[in-house]
Design a protein with these regions (language model features):
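Active-site entrance/lid segments in N-terminal catalytic domains of soluble metabolic enzymes
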Residues: 1-118
Length: 118
C-alpha cells in the first residue's frame, strides 16, 4: 500500500481516496478508473434501472480486480431490485444514503460485505 491508515486498511485500497457516488456521473468507467488508480471507486445507483445497475457492476468487475462499491440511495423506488442485484453480483462494499429503511435491508445484513450508511 502506498499509504497505510485506517481507510486504506478498511477498504484494502492503496490511497485514502473514496470517490463520491454521484448519481449520473459515477458509472462503471469512473468507478473502475478510481479503483485502478488505488482509491475506492463507487457506482452511483440512484439514477439506474435495476438491469442498468447490473451491467455497470459487471463492467466494473471486468475493468478492475480492485475493491469497488455501490452507493444505494434509500429513496429509490425499486430498492428491493437493487438490493437483489447487489447480492447476486456479490458487490464487496455498499454505501446506503438518503435515509434509512427499517425493512427490506435484512438480505444485505446477511451478506459477507462491508455496509456503511451515509
Amino acid at each position: 500500500m502506498l499509504f497505510e491508515n485506517r481507510i486504506t486498511s478498511l477498504f484494502k485500497i492503496d490511497l485514502p481516496i473514496i470517490q463520491a457516488g454521484m448519481v449520473w456521473a459515477s458509472g462503471w468507467e469512473l468507478a473502475s478508473a478510481v479503483s485502478n488508480a488505488g482509491g475506492l471507486g463507487i457506482i452511483g445507483a440512484g439514477s439506474m434501472y435495476p438491469e442498468v445497475l447490473r451491467t455497470h457492476i459487471q463492467k466494473t468487475k471486468t475493468a478492475t480486480t480492485k475493491p469497488f462499491a455501490v452507493n444505494l440511495p434509500m429513496l429509490y423506488p425499486d430498492l428491493q431490485a437493487h438490493i437483489n442485484i447487489i447480492i447476486e453480483e456479490k458487490v464487496p462494499i455498499v454505501f446506503t444514503s438518503a435515509g434509512i429503511k427499517k425493512h427490506g435491508l435484512q438480505p444485505l445484513k446477511k451478506m459477507e460485505l462491508q455496509w456503511y450508511m451515509l
